Amino acid sequence: MVSQFDTQHLLNSNTALVAGVDEAGRGPLAGPVVVAAVVFDPSQPRINGLNDSKQLSPACRERLYAHIVERALAYKVVMIDSTQIDTLNIYQATMLGMRLAVEGVAHVAKSARIDGNRLPKNLPCPAEALVGGDARDPTIMAASILAKVTRDRHMVELHLQYPHYGFDKHKGYGTPAHLAALAEHGPCLEHRQSFAPVRRMLTPKAIHARQSAHQHNDNSPTKAAFNMLIERDD
């Protein structure tokens, strides 16, 4: 367990308003990494069936998603797209998403508990990192479900735009079917060009298309946020 601030009060309190934070989609070859933060009222009963999203069926995740949104005092879901992932790297993109998600619930949360062993910089509240938190902490479990469901829905939408790749089935992960589609059609704008299986199949046309899309998105709020992150890390 890693602490950015003095979190002894957090560990000893049963009534603290704690934001659980988790991500989905660090490993895929395409699509965004999605981070969610959730705050529950600790005086209310736990939602039945909460678990690490990877241990739940899609139907169960969808059912729990509705309950989580209904019961949460606050929640925030952040998507960091493939262009930003390629600019920052997947680790820094995930850290950015976590910081933005916590900022989105900081008006309610007094502290944050984040799945993993690292914490983002410049969080707006005290925080702790909890290894295996998505299997240990109900609030992190809820965040993992919001992140996973949001990302899966987004990949189904991307399938309508790019039907050749089967995003609706593998959600961007490097399955044999996805790799075969990459070999046949080459990467699209949603592929992560910094990931080796995609990078090996890049063409000048694909690189130019990504650069054009990157320039088009230069003024987005999230782009400004990750520029600030890069400056702080220099």
Swiss-Prot record:
Report keywords, A-Z: Cytoplasm, Endonuclease, Hydrolase, Manganese, Metal-binding, Nuclease
Name of the coding gene: rnhB
Query: What's the short name of a Pfam family annotated to this entry?
Result: RNase_HII
Cellular localisation: Cytoplasm
Protein task? Endonuclease that specifically degrades the RNA of RNA-DNA hybrids.
Per UniProt, a divalent metal cation binds at D22, E23, D115
What's the cofactor? Mn(2+); Mg(2+)
The GO biological-process annotations, alphabetized, read as: DNA replication, removal of RNA primer; mismatch repair
PROSITE patterns (alphabetical): RNASE_H_2 (PS51975)
Q: What is this protein called?
A: Ribonuclease HII
Q: Which PANTHER family match?
A: RIBONUCLEASE H2 SUBUNIT A, RIBONUCLEASE HII
- Note on how the cofactor is bound: Manganese or magnesium. Binds 1 divalent metal ion per monomer in the absence of substrate. May bind a second metal ion after substrate binding.
